[in-house]
Amino acid sequence: MNYLIFKVIYANANIVVGEHNFIGYQIRIPKDYELEINKFCKLYLYEYISIMPNKNLIIKDLYGFRTYNERLLFIDLISINSIGPKTAINILKYDIDTIIDAIATKNIDYLITIKGINQRNANLICDQLNYKYINKVNDKNNWAKELSIGLENLGYTKKDIEYAITKVKINSQQDIDISEIISSAIKEISLRHEN
């Protein structure tokens, strides 16, 4: 199961209880998604199974994420030996783009500010995931260069271009066409001049 659309029965900052086809689900979430009770919601799911052989126990936990990219980062994080699901959830309480930038740039100082992450874990995360995310951050920086060149060719001032670069949101996990980015930037610049 990749995602689930369900009716929210209960929600707080850590857990959502939902119902789908008369089956109840308790789903752990990284942050408060401000879900409304009795409304429908879509979460991307990951089922984590832990086995305790000395107690003959199999524990299943369901984790839910608002975006598919959060789910992918969670899976990448728990693939690291010393990072379990609780630590991965703590990491995902922060902005996903900031976390990805920190991993790609090996910003250990930022990562150790996260609860549950020590120097050793931060080094492991960067060493094992850096190669995966560095290209995404470089792509994001390339978009800014292309946007700047495109707006300059259209006759916008340097001040407008700098403003547009700070306002246009480019998701580092998603492929976006440069023409879409330029049109978003033009809208931002237009709104600025209207005010």
UniProtKB/Swiss-Prot annotation:
Location of this chain's protein in the cell: Cytoplasm
Stored Gene3D superfamilies: 5' to 3' exonuclease, C-terminal subdomain
A molecular-function term among this protein's GO annotations: ATP binding
Major subcellular location class: cytoplasm
SUPFAM superfamilies: RuvA domain 2-like
Annotated keywords: Cytoplasm, DNA damage, DNA recombination, DNA repair, DNA-binding
DNA-binding in keyword set: yes
GO cellular component: cytoplasm; Holliday junction helicase complex; Holliday junction resolvase complex
Record remark on domains: Has three domains with a flexible linker between the domains II and III and assumes an 'L' shape. Domain III is highly mobile and contacts RuvB.
Family membership noted in the UniProt record: Belongs to the RuvA family.
Protein name from the UniProt record: Holliday junction branch migration complex subunit RuvA
